[in-house]
Amino acid sequence: MNNYLETTHDVYKEAALTPDIGLCCTTNPIWELPGLKIPQIMQEMNYGCGSTVHARDLANNPKMLYVGVGGGMELLQFSYFNRQKGGVIGVDVVDEMLQASRENFKEAEAQNDWFKSEFVDLKKGDAMNLPVEGNSIDVAAQNCLFNIFKADDLKKAIAEMYRV
């Protein structure tokens, strides 16, 4: 890893272990949809600055990819539109963030009768080499993650999003 990516990894590892509400520049508004309840811990671990996807883009059960899982909030929101096993893929390089999301999905299951953790397939990987087959995704998204990349790494990450 490059030095700046190692530093970022360390910051998000700590944020997974101890939620840091003020970590990001702002907080995203929570999607208000009938029957969707966002657990408090997911809100506290929402380290994005606004979704790159609008709910109207998620018609017809799209297969979705989300890179940089945070506390799992956007994965839960995307699952609302694709209630199928593995219908949403979440990729993160930080093991602790993946584990935090898994734990948060248990709370989401308790609060949302329609949600099952199996709707989300969490994978270890990074944005510049996604562990996802080419042309297998209908909607690929990220939330502020790409803001940290230097130009060459950003080009690789964008190319990967288009590949899948």
Residues of each region from the PLM?
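N-terminal auxiliary segments of SAM/dcSAM-dependent transferases
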Residues: 1-27
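Class I SAM-dependent methyltransferase SAM/SAH-binding core
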Residues: 60-129
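A short His-aromatic
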Residues: 81, 147-151
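A short acidic, Gly/Pro-enriched loop at the edge of an enzyme's catalytic core
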Residues: 128-140, 152
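A short beta-strand submotif of the Rossmann-like class I SAM-dependent methyltransferase core
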Residues: 141-145
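A short glycine-rich, Lys/Arg-flanked "PGG" loop and its adjoining helix->strand segment in the class I
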Residues: 155-164
